[in-house]
Amino acid sequence: MTVVNFSKAGRALAGLFLCAASMGASADIILGHSGDLSGTSAALTTDYVRGMNAYFDDINKKGGVRGEKIKLVSLDDGFNPDKTAENTKALIEQNAVALVGFRGTANMLKIVPIVQGAGIAQIGNTSGAKSLRDPYVPNLFHVRASTTDEIEAAVNHAWTIGINKIAVAYQDDAFGKEGLDALTAAMQKRGAKPVAVAPVPRGTVDVDKAVDAIAAAQPQAVILIAQAKPNAAFIKAYKAKGASAQFMVLSVSSGLHAELKEPAAGTIVSQVVPYPFTELGNAVVREYQTIISATPDKKFSYNSMEGFLNAKLVVRALQKTPAPLTRAKLISTLETFTSEDLGGFALTYSKQSNLGSRFVNLTMIRADGTFAR
């Protein structure tokens, strides 16, 4: 597979045009990706793309889709919604048949009108936002469960083990605010409310005010609705104050240990894809492990597993779409996936639903960075 991957947006766009020009007469299937390759979630984005690349490479080695090779063009948006919109327009103009694996709720909300105006599918993204699911948003096809599903699982677990004094620090953007709403609703169902609520500015690690506000409330648990870097900064600062609590984070922060190391131990992380390390009873996990083991970076991870599943869904849809391939035909095919099993991971779509999966599993970070279930 040819992968065009640029860490600077200006350079990326220039490279994209050159790449597209060279591909103009070919029958290659062009897929477009925009993500944070240089900002606070760069490591997670890169790992996600690694999973997509691994699967696309494997398909191309086997002859591609009806003899056509898949080409992924990946552009850096630095987690900036305006840059995501710019990249999206460029990818559409250069004949991408679908957009895959985007990151960020604000980023996704920014591109919805662009995607719908172009009649192109956006397949798989890392946002669990309700606003991208309910009411139904045409042209989006989610792979992961929603943030609401993740938070409900976390709160339910807390209640089960006798924790009901919960505080929340949230990323001050659409993602964080929707997560806060989901947490508030989950606690209201149980006749409670958060004991403290504190925002963290988007795209920063400015956590001191949030740490002070939450530590003063002495919660039993703190749910962090943010990316890995600010979450790591929060936990480090919170522990430095001598305060203690059970920390709980969402799947977008599964790279927490890489940022925080041993102090991340004991943190509960909700996961939205199957356990990628030893769950050999799951067919798609076995396939993932076999393919990833044949790549230069043989490391198994949740982020690359999610990217892998996204790529597998894309290829399944491409294979089932009748030739000649068009954006509209691909969307129509995806809408027929009312119960599409990727090998132990099922996805559900229709003309009025883009939910995909509701799979959530809770894990705990060990001191060495591995996950216990």
Where are these regions (language model features)?
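Beta-alpha junction/loop-to-helix N-cap segments that form part of ligand/metal-binding clefts
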Residues: 30, 43-50, 63-131, 201-204, ...
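Periplasmic-binding protein-like
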Residues: 91-103, 123-125, 167-170, 218-227, ...
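Extracytoplasmic "Venus flytrap"
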Residues: 32-52, 75-82, 103-106, 169-177, ...
